[in-house]
Curated annotation (Swiss-Prot):
The gene is sparc. Its main location: secreted. This is SPARC. Residues 258-293 form the EF-hand domain. Glycans are attached at residue 113. Detected in long bone (at protein level). Ca(2+) binds at residues 271, 273, 275, 277, 282. It is found in: Secreted, Extracellular space, Extracellular matrix, Basement membrane. One of its GO terms (molecular function) is collagen binding. Residues 1-17 form the signal peptide. Keywords: Basement membrane, Calcium, Copper, Disulfide bond, Extracellular matrix, Glycoprotein, Metal-binding, Secreted, Signal. Residues 68-90 form the Follistatin-like domain. Pfam families: FOLN, Kazal_1, SPARC_Ca_bdg. One of its GO terms (biological process) is regulation of synapse organization. The lineage of its organism: Eukaryota, Metazoa, Chordata, Craniata, Vertebrata.
Amino acid sequence: MRVWVFFVLCLAGKALAAPQQDALPEEEEVIEDVPAEETVGTNPVQVDVGEFDEAINEEEEEEPSENPCLNHHCKHGKVCEVDESNTPLCVCQDPSTCPTSVGEFEKICGTDNKTYDSSCHFFATKCTLEGTKKGHKLHLDYIGPCKYIAPCLDNELSEFPLRIGDWLKNVLVSLYERDENNNLLNEKQKLRVKKIHENEKRLESWRPHSELLVRDFEKNYNMYIFPVHWQFGQLDQHPIDGYLSHTELSPLRAPLIPMEHCTTRFFDECDIDDDKYIALEEWAKCFGIKEQDVDKDMIV
């Protein structure tokens, strides 16, 4: 999986790098060996939400076994131990017991601007801070060691959603072209992307440069509506409630920040009412989608 995420992040870096500036070095992912979880989303830059999910607190129990911990699953940052009555329970993992990272790509930066050796170290530390103000504020910020992120200027921020929107459209077209028997898209999604794909083939001889992104968005506006809805649906998973939390955004924003310095400001300003959640209407507005074109039924 490490190789897969490394490949897709490279792909995303190439697709998203701002043409007016040098691409930031790609400082990749946070991967630890955890039980396989159901894949969330099919966006190739979107890292499995399980890697960053701070909100799923279920501790599942199955049939008793010799070792009660074998079938007792704990969330990230916790490990299973048994008490005096041989009952399994989840306790915070000691960060010193985490495996040593093997490269820079395993390091992550927290919102405390501290570099953690791996996701294991980060979540174990966060667990020990549960119930404290510091722990409540601590989240995974981005993949790779902490580094200087240049401020996002107003003119750069205005271009960012156009570039991301164009990229989302291209991601969907690519999935459609590769989706013969892979079930990357469901049937309803394929029907919506089919028209976008046909239009893309017609326009493939002309691809927009940065200064032409606005013109392309205005001219081909209808081609951007579904990709924006689709990406929202890919992220809105825990729970599926029509709102994106910081945790739900992490699979997309964490790989982007080292490559796109406007990522944090963009998502912060998407939260128009500043309630720490991004509703579909706020998300669509951030990408320039008109209010009358926002449709919950488009998230299929």
